[in-house]
Amino acid sequence: MHIGVAGNIGSGKTTLTRMLAEHYGWKPQFESVTYNPYLEDYYKDIPRWSYNLETYFLAQRFRDVLEISKSKETIIQDRTISEGVYIFVANNYEMGNLSDRDYQTYMQLFELMMSTVKQPDLLIYLKSGIEHLVANIQKRGREYEQSISIEYLDGLNRHYEQWISKYTGPLLIVETDNIDFKNNPEDFAAITDRIDAQLFGLF
């Protein structure tokens, strides 16, 4: 089984992925940012490095999806392959950070890849407001993220909402602005109760 956790930068995806993996005994698959050779340059000059960064991420996510499809374990994934395309690439293209030529080349690659993979058995979307995202980004203190603009985050949020509104697979939306699932066991239990109901038909 494949569980995907989706959400904007700073929404708590990695934290929730780790907690759910521990709770259910699932195997977590985290998106690696440590070894992306473009990430630091990207946040310094987004137009220059958008195509390089997004193509690198696409290759990594496709590799992850292929591994998940072959696994007999239940895997919970931090960020799905579709997010890279419908959120980050779409936002960069809209903002003029990707040329028409680069965008079309990227989409051709993505469409070829998607012909071989399927949607997660459940997608958990962490819906977060800008203030919540900014607070989390500042709190975790990653240097390369401190230059992210409000405009950029807002564009990502808008594309997330558009994508989720058209999503056709099994979906669970968690609004994160007024909960603290990391530190409040009741908030985390409320999420797992909803997952139990969706996956296992438990009340």
Model-identified regions with their sequence ranges:
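P-loop (Walker A) phosphate-binding loop of NTP-binding proteins
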Residues: N8
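Conserved lysine of the Walker
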Residues: K13
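Hydrophobic anchor at the beta1->P-loop junction of P-loop NTPases
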Residues: V5
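NTP-dependent small-molecule kinase module
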Residues: V134-F203
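A basic- and aromatic-enriched beta-loop-alpha substructure that forms the phosphate/nucleotide-
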Residues: R61-R101
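Post-Walker A alpha-helix
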Residues: L16-T17
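A glycine- and Lys/Arg-enriched "phosphate-lid" helix/loop adjacent to the NTP-binding pocket
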Residues: I87-H159
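Conserved substrate/cofactor phosphate-moiety recognition/catalytic segment
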Residues: E22-Q60
